[in-house]
């Protein structure tokens, strides 16, 4: 199975830009890959929230909203499965989510991050939620499981992930290490951690092009 890990430019809170970038990558790699995987919070950017729920709820995207519909339509048109991260609005709650959509445009899996590192716990309330567990699903004949960023660094979670025995573990992250840090040590730490989580673990990180961002 040909899986493309797309490290794409992201601008915080610029959903139109981020969505267009995602769609352009899908179009460019149709016929060249069977699944294209984007990083954590690709649609809104990792630093898109301010922890004021009345403001943040307008940043969240529901499964029925136009951006998701457009991605589903593109997956069907290009016959290309896609997995991407976003802040999902579900009722009165927000989640850091990873959606996987099949080449028929149908939702294959919806994963909610299980660790709290996506939010400022000192400023958030019950509106900001996490999922409970990892789960295995099938796409194009292979079994997959998803863990978002800090999920696979959380005590007990690597063992939980490995126990699923998925063919492929998708590990979308949002990291801001300098090239020197990454190449000197951090990439080896991630490789060691990935080995604890499964046989084939695929890490993908977007890159932030927002000049006002802190990273």
Residue ranges and their predicted role:
Residues 61, 89-164, 177-192:
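Active-site catalytic loop in hydrolytic enzyme cores
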Residues 7-25:
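N-terminal phosphate-binding loop and adjacent alpha-helix
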Residues 1-5:
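Extreme N-terminal starter segment of soluble prokaryotic enzymes
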Residues 18, 27-54, 75, 82-83, ...:
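Active-site beta-strand/loop signature of hydrolases that rely on acidic residues for catalysis
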Residues 79-85, 113-122, 202-206:
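Short Pro/Gly-enriched beta-strand edge/turn motifs at strand-loop
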Residues 56-69, 126:
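A short acidic, glycine-rich active-site loop
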Residues 13, 46-47, 179, 211:
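Glycine/Thr-rich phosphate-binding loops of Rossmann-like dinucleotide-binding domains
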Residues 63-81, 153-215:
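CN hydrolase (nitrilase-like) catalytic-core segments centered on the catalytic cysteine
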């Amino acid at each position: 199975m040909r899986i493309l890990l797309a490290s794409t430019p992201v601008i915080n809170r610029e959903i139109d830009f981020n969505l267009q970038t995602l769609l352009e990558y899908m179009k460019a790699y149709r016929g060249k890959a069977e699944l294209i995987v984007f990083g954590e919070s690709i649609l809104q950017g990792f630093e898109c929230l301010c922890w004021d729920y009345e403001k943040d709820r307008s940043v969240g995207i529901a499964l029925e909203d136009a951006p998701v519909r457009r991605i589903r339509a593109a997956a069907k048109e290009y016959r290309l499965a896609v997995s991407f991260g976003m802040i999902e609005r579900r009722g009165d709650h927000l989640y850091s989510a990873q959606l996987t959509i099949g080449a028929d445009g149908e939702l294959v899996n919806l994963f909610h991050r299980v660790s709290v590192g996506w939010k400022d716990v000192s400023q958030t309330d019950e509106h900001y939620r996490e999922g409970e567990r990892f789960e295995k699903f099938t796409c194009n004949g292979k079994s997959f499981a998803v863990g978002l960023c800090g999920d696979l660094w959380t005590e007990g979670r690597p063992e939980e992930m490995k126990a699923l025995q998925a063919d492929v573990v998708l590990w979308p992250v949002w990291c801001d290490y300098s090239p020197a840090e990454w190449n000197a040590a951090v990439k080896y730490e991630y490789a060691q951690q990935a080995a604890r989580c499964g046989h084939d673990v695929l890490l993908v990180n977007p890159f932030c092009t927002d000049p006002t961002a802190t990273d």
